[in-house]
Amino acid sequence: MMKFLLVLFLITITLITMAYSEEHGCIPPFQPCEGVNSRCCGLYVCFNKICLATP
């Protein structure tokens, strides 16, 4: 049950972030990006050419 809730939570956060990115012109999580100065959404940073969450 906890795994299901965690997956549901992560999907919800991703969808909200993607909707936010369309509005503000930033790169959604897990999408390709170029360099450290890329505009990844929220607390995400460009790492290995993909927007990932900060540790």
Curated annotation (Swiss-Prot):
List the GO terms this entry assigns under cellular component, sorted alphabetically: extracellular region
- Its chief place of residence is secreted
Protein location: Secreted
Q: Tell me, what is one Gene Ontology molecular-function annotation carried by this entry?
A: toxin activity
According to UniProt, the tissues expressing it are described as: Expressed by the venom gland (posterior main gland) (at protein level).
Cystine links in this protein are 26-41, 33-46, 40-51
Q: Which domain of life is it from?
A: Eukaryota
Q: What are the protein's UniProt keywords? A: Calcium channel impairing toxin, Disulfide bond, Ion channel impairing toxin, Knottin, Neurotoxin, Secreted, Signal, Toxin, Voltage-gated calcium channel impairing toxin
Q: Does Electron transport appear among the keywords?
A: no
Family the entry assigns: Belongs to the venom Ptu1-like knottin family.
What does this chain do?
Binds reversibly and blocks P/Q-type voltage-gated calcium channels (Cav).
UniProt free text on domains: The presence of a 'disulfide through disulfide knot' structurally defines this protein as a knottin.
This protein is called what?
U-reduvitoxin-Pr2a
